[in-house]
Amino acid sequence: MTSDFKVIIVGGSVAGLSLAHCLEKIGVSFVVLEKGNQIAPQLGASIGILPNGGRILDQLGIFHSIEDEIEPLESAMMRYPDGFSFKSQYPQALHTSFGYPVAFLERQRFLQILYDKLKSKDCVFTNKRVVSIASGQDKVTAKTSDGAKYLADIVIGADGVHSIVRSEIWRHLKENSQISVLEAPNASIKHDYSCIYGISLNVPQIILGIQLNCLDDGVSIHLFTGKQSKLFWFVIIKTPQASFAKVEIDNTHTARCICEGLRTKKVSDTLCFEDVWSRCTIFKMTPLEEGVFKHWNYGRLACIGDAIRKMAPNNGQGANMAIEDACSLANILQKKISHGSIRDQDINSMFQEFSMAQRARTESVCAQSEFLVRMHANQGIGRRLLGRYLIPFLYDAPAGLSGFSISGATRIEFIDLPTRSLRGAWGKSWRGSWEFILQSLVYLRPKFRIVYALYLVAAAAFILYCLSSLFP
């Protein structure tokens, strides 16, 4: 390592390992403290890598290993309660526009790749639960449950929604009267849905490269094909507030009861959820938190990933935004180091710069996620009408929504862009839906063009009205 600056990363999952890779590239010393006994445990979860995450991983020299593990998505089928369905080419549209496929693979395998590609494996420690963090005048110390102490210049919390680093940030803010003692850390977090996720094998009637979605009342089912006859799936279900404690305490029994009740749900014309559930090899249930935490840093402490935001998996951006966080923080750190050693007074400004760089984008992507999970579950008359009667006739509206969130993505500024990303629509306005509308008008018979155009204008106006809050 070429820098005297040292970073403690609390948490060895997507955000933590991504940051470790970025720090390795700029020569900054680090340690990763993971509380679990494995870096890549098998929890039955899958992970979606969209072009914004894929581009960063490609810059880090990792994406080719991920591509070897995936069955790229090409299209998606959306099915509604009345049996109506439509096909979206959003995965292929995103691949064509940004240069990277929509990739789904086992979360365990993804984490293993991140770890295997890391050169400084001796800096990654498991069974290291951080129990306290003490800030000194010029250093910070993290103490783990086994009594070990680690000294560094800053501590980055990549330790998820129940982050001890974020708890320490809130404690300091309250002690220094920067926030009210009555202000709750989770005040901005919603708990409206739960997620059951799992992996099934050898499910019949599955076509590789096609994502299947059942968008029912209060529940949505999503299926993604993988290699080796694996099918990754998750069920998002509206959950009463009083039931969340039960979900956390006895999630296996609760999940089993819910899935048993969904057996007859048709995911396609030829496939019922029974076909998926009966071939399930592993599953788990978890409450879904949604929202952006208000405070991200204090002193020498800062958070990234799920420690600063939580979103439903419907837009597939959770892991990708965590990767972007790591990239954004590394960009700022690299600039500081390139101008000489980092002074104590530079640390707070560095974290403030990170917050300014990521907060607006974070809030926008989270708003999109909140909108999607509710539209997929047909919650509210406006979302129900939008999903069932308008979006299907705009052809690639799903691609447009995804394209909006991808086009403004962060990239590693100190590493050249890969060739495949140079042809992409990065940083440009996403006009896929509107281009299709203009093209479709050309091929319609003249007497239908006016009717179709008026319908699309009305549909577009309604969509813009519904989505206006999502794209500030």
Swiss-Prot record:
Keywords: FAD, Flavoprotein, Glycoprotein, Membrane, Monooxygenase, Oxidoreductase, Transmembrane, Transmembrane helix. It comes from the Eukaryota. FAD binds at E34, G48, R107, D306, A319. It is found in: Membrane. GO terms for cellular component: membrane. Pfam families: FAD_binding_3 (PF01494). Its main location: membrane. Its cofactor is FAD. Induction: Expression is down-regulated when the stress-activated mitogen-activated protein kinase (sakA) is deleted. Its EC number is 1.-.-.-. InterPro entries: FAD-bd (IPR002938), FAD/NAD-bd_sf (IPR036188), FAD_mOase_fung (IPR050562). Glycans are attached at N186. It is a multi-pass membrane protein. Pathway: Secondary metabolite biosynthesis. The chain crosses the membrane at residues 7-27, 450-470. FAD-dependent monooxygenase; part of the gene cluster that mediates the biosynthesis of lolitrems, indole-diterpene mycotoxins that are potent tremorgens in mammals, and are synthesized by clavicipitaceous fungal endophytes in association with their grass hosts. The geranylgeranyl diphosphate (GGPP) synthase ltmG is proposed to catalyze the first step in lolitrem biosynthesis. LtmG catalyzes a series of iterative condensations of isopentenyl diphosphate (IPP) with dimethylallyl diphosphate (DMAPP), geranyl diphosphate (GPP), and farnesyl diphosphate (FPP), to form GGPP. Belongs to the paxM FAD-dependent monooxygenase family. This is FAD-dependent monooxygenase ltmM. The lineage of its organism: Eukaryota, Fungi, Dikarya, Ascomycota, Pezizomycotina. The gene is ltmM.
